[in-house]
Amino acid sequence: MQTTANHSSRSTQTGTRAHGAALAETTSREDFRALATEHRVVPVIRKVLADSETPLSAYRKLAANRPGTFLLESAENGRSWSRWSFIGAGAPSALTVRDNAAAWLGTAPEGAPSGGDPLDALRATLDLLKTEAMAGLPPLSSGLVGFFAYDMVRRLERLPELAVDDLGLPDMLLLLATDIAAVDHHEGTITLIANAVNWNGTDERVDWAYDDAVARLDVMTKALGQPLTSAVATFSRPAPDHRAQRTMEEYTEIVDKLVGDIEAGEAFQVVPSQRFEMDTAADPLDVYRILRVTNPSPYMYLLNIPDADGGLDFSIVGSSPEALVTVKDGRATTHPIAGTRWRGATEEEDVLLEKELLADEKERAEHLMLVDLGRNDLGRVCRPGTVRVDDYSHIERYSHVMHLVSTVTGELAEDKTALDAVTACFPAGTLSGAPKVRAMELIEEVEKTRRGLYGGVVGYLDFAGNADFAIAIRTALMRNGTAYVQAGGGVVADSNGPYEYTEAANKARAVLNAIAAAATLAEP
């Protein structure tokens, strides 16, 4: 996820103890024993020079598309790449939902709850593994990485159940990320991290945990040293052969119905959507390769979601421009995005389009509504008087579009956590509408199928109390030879059905085009 944190480098003396709760370039047994007395999750690290590796080559060597692995990257404002890329090379377990209750896949941490409400189990797991932040580590060194589906909101709000659950996705799945490689683009290094999680604290158990972590580091180091077959490939850009869930006429009927609801005072804005499906033999990694070139965004991700037997259930490939919420050191931040123009062909055209967007009263009114919604969401979990709006309604340029963006921040209340901030903001107002609950009720009346991943979030909660979640848009779910992409847009009183249909199709196009192009990759 957002990978811009500027962490200072540490001593390069192997085995030396840095000041406080910090780690040197390599974790010694003595360092580990000292940290194990105070921490439930202890990272064992090894920093290696890897200036000839790319995030993709490192991912291919360390993760190789195995179930339970991931790749997270970030391109700031769709242009320059951020400092860090993160590769999840191993996850012994995942917290998910089965039979409407929390369940662990794989080997759960000792003492972790199972059964009951999934959010309660998640909260208890984060509390069980809570660990003081350690200086000198990359922004993501351990935690739970995965997704919340849009339909997780049914555990937060009472909604009608009218849409068909045809994909049967779990409401959430979060990988226990124990083995991580953090690629530092500034230094040309990779920090390999093997976490020891929740042992009983005896000397024998601590030594075993250290030896096990070092063995995993050895495996990762050896894998990085292996040569790869060439990743050079030719490709073409065919038009995607996809199926839309609804025709323009059917979608226009939905828009007209919602406009009537808005005129009747039911809501100010509602965000309907529709799904696009595409048969494909493309590798999810190849889709990611194309997408990161054609549509670089602040949140780029590839996750391979395991099933109950340890096989691959589905993959998530996305390039999202928008965060739901981030929490860092007790400060929660959300970035409402509303108001869009396509990028111009020249700088002069971009400037003219920016002026047009800033002068559009309708776009500015919708943006203000979502900023107010963000303030209200954070106000539920932040200390009174700390919620504020910064950089109100400024332009941010991305690879293909520009948006009106604001920043809303607040200090978490003492009795609130990063998970509380996520649930307070969930789902995003930009994907539901305002007032949020009534808008979701109206969405349930008009959409045929449950949204699943679309409008949910992809990201992580770490064990030091931080979180970073992107809204799951510009995202494909790939399962058993079919890719599912969903898109929509905000409907207000003067919305036009054919325009909204075209707008949804345009938003889905970047991902559909990437899938079509990925299927043509071939060795030259």
From Swiss-Prot:
UniProt pathway: Amino-acid biosynthesis; L-tryptophan biosynthesis; L-tryptophan from chorismate: step 1/5
Isoglutamyl lysine isopeptide (Lys-Gln) (interchain with Q-Cter in protein Pup) crosslink site(s): 355
Cofactor binding: number and manner: Binds 1 Mg(2+) ion per subunit.
Residues the entry annotates as binding Mg(2+): 366, 503
Regulation: Feedback inhibited by tryptophan.
Bias (Polar residues) ranges: 1-16
GO molecular function terms attached to this record: anthranilate synthase activity; metal ion binding
List of residues binding chorismate: 339-340, 454, 474, 488-490
Binding site for L-tryptophan: 74, 298-300
EC number from the UniProt entry: 4.1.3.27
UniProt keywords, alphabetically: Amino-acid biosynthesis, Aromatic amino acid biosynthesis, Isopeptide bond, Lyase, Magnesium, Metal-binding, Tryptophan biosynthesis, Ubl conjugation
Keyword 4Fe-4S assigned: no
Catalytic activity annotation: chorismate + L-glutamine = anthranilate + pyruvate + L-glutamate + H(+)
GO terms, biological process: L-tryptophan biosynthetic process
Annotated InterPro entries: ADC_synthase, Anth_synth_I-like, Anth_synth_I_N, Anth_synth_I_PabB, Chorismate_C
Cofactor(s) the protein needs: Mg(2+)
Region (Disordered): 1-25
Function description: Part of a heterotetrameric complex that catalyzes the two-step biosynthesis of anthranilate, an intermediate in the biosynthesis of L-tryptophan. In the first step, the glutamine-binding beta subunit (TrpG) of anthranilate synthase (AS) provides the glutamine amidotransferase activity which generates ammonia as a substrate that, along with chorismate, is used in the second step, catalyzed by the large alpha subunit of AS (TrpE) to produce anthranilate. In the absence of TrpG, TrpE can synthesize anthranilate directly from chorismate and high concentrations of ammonia.
Assigned protein family: Belongs to the anthranilate synthase component I family.
Subunit structure: Heterotetramer consisting of two non-identical subunits: a beta subunit (TrpG) and a large alpha subunit (TrpE).
Protein name stated in the entry: Anthranilate synthase component 1
Organism expressing this protein natively: Mycolicibacterium smegmatis (strain ATCC 700084 / mc(2)155) (Mycobacterium smegmatis)
